[in-house]
Amino acid sequence: MAIILGADAHGNALKELIKSFLQEESYDIIDVTDINSDFIDNTLAVAKAVNEAEGRLGIMVDAYGAGPFMVATKLKGMVAAEVSDERSAYMTRGHNNARMITIGAEIVGPELAKNIVKGFVTGPYDGGRHQIRVDMLNKMA
């Protein structure tokens, strides 16, 4: 599984910590960060890279997470969630089949960020009754 990472200048330090953590866990990392671009361009780069292949997940980090969430959910086929706790990160994979999360570096500290990322990348999609919701989400954008 490849994990696509992106950040703007406000989220880059936390993104680098997340990157190191994921590399230690032996995940394939594709970092599409352009430190000179704002969160919109970096979020689009992450979301597009995630949508290029099945089995990819994306993580975008900026100051608060809200802006990248809004950008990502504008794209066809992208189910994303703004998260600031481990349980939400895990559950958005299980119930919503989210392929991307956004994190705010001014909200989430280093250890919590690692736990959020772990929950997201290890959380399986439950399917079943949740597939109806996922199909509805995919039709919207």
UniProtKB/Swiss-Prot annotation:
Class of the enzyme per the UniProt entry, highest EC level: isomerase
Record-level GO BP terms: D-allose catabolic process; galactose catabolic process; lactose catabolic process via tagatose-6-phosphate; pentose-phosphate shunt, non-oxidative branch
Gene Ontology MF terms in the entry: galactose-6-phosphate isomerase activity; ribose-5-phosphate isomerase activity
Enzyme Commission numbers on file: 5.3.1.26
Record keywords, A-Z: Isomerase, Lactose metabolism
Family matches, as SUPFAM superfamilies: Ribose/Galactose isomerase RpiB/AlsB
Keyword Isomerase found: yes
Reaction(s) this enzyme catalyzes, per UniProt: aldehydo-D-galactose 6-phosphate = keto-D-tagatose 6-phosphate
Pfam families: LacAB_rpiB
Pathway, per record: Carbohydrate metabolism; D-galactose 6-phosphate degradation; D-tagatose 6-phosphate from D-galactose 6-phosphate: step 1/1
Family per similarity comment: Belongs to the LacAB/RpiB family.
Subunit structure: Heteromultimeric protein consisting of LacA and LacB.
Annotated protein name in UniProt: Galactose-6-phosphate isomerase subunit LacA 1
Gene: lacA1
